[in-house]
Design a protein with these regions (language model features):
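Active-site neighborhoods and metal-handling regions in enzymes and metal-associated proteins
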Residues: 1-205
Length: 205
């Protein structure tokens, strides 16, 4: 029986730092939604995010020597999947844009992403994609109760996606986070219940 935290032992203060950091990251995402408009470039948004991270007393994890990414945030537009650095691309109304951000607050890392449509409401297939993937996220979160295996989380996510007739990019997975940006375990978006790594209360993914 695995009795240690797969994502590393953390003090209550470190867990609280992650909660506080997560709130700061969520606020930055709202700031992006309020700020972005057609006519701005991806690099404009990167600079804006960099300034907000500093304003909120955190640091841009991507820009550290550990990661050495050329920007504060990943910005992936339309057919780009994920992890794209900001470019000179100028946003147009209706662009589908994903933002992936990691910040460090009090030495603890928090990592999240969201997708939006520039200057418009999602419609048709794009609306179905965004609403279904969001529901799959919350299905995965709802599967986390007490000791749980990563396969249970993955299976809950996969069911929503399959019911919505969406494909799954199997090479991209969730992961542990906290003491480092990327930590074990991998948390795929597909899987079987009662398989995978056992998580305990105190693990952070």
């Amino acid at each position: 029986v695995q009795d240690r935290l797969i994502t590393g032992e953390k003090t209550p203060e470190q867990i609280q730092a992650m909660r506080d950091g997560g709130k700061k990251l969520a606020q930055i995402f709202q700031d992006i939604r309020d700020y972005i408009h057609a006519g701005m470039s991806e690099k404009d948004i990167d600079a804006f995010v960099d300034s907000k991270i500093k304003e909120y007393g955190a640091s841009a994890t991507y820009k550290t020597d550990e990661v050495n990414f050329p920007g504060a945030i990943c910005i992936s537009t339309n057919d780009e999947i994920v992890h794209s650095p900001a470019s000179d691309y100028i946003f147009q109304k209706g662009d589908v844009v994903s933002f992936d951000l990691v910040i460090t607050y009090k030495d603890m890392k928090v990592d999240s992403a969201f997708t939006m449509v520039v200057d418009d409401k999602p419609k048709g297939a794009v609306k179905h994609l965004l609403t279904t993937t969001e529901r799959s996220l919350y299905a995965g979160i709802d599967a986390i109760k007490g000791d749980v295996r990563t396969g249970n989380i993955a299976a809950a996510i996969e069911k929503v996606l399959k019911d919505g007739k969406l494909g799954i990019i199997r090479e991209l997975v969730g992961h542990g986070v906290g003491l480092k940006m990327h930590m074990p375990p991998d948390v795929p978006n597909y899987g079987r219940k009662h398989t995978g790594v056992l998580l305990h209360p105190g693990d952070t993914i």
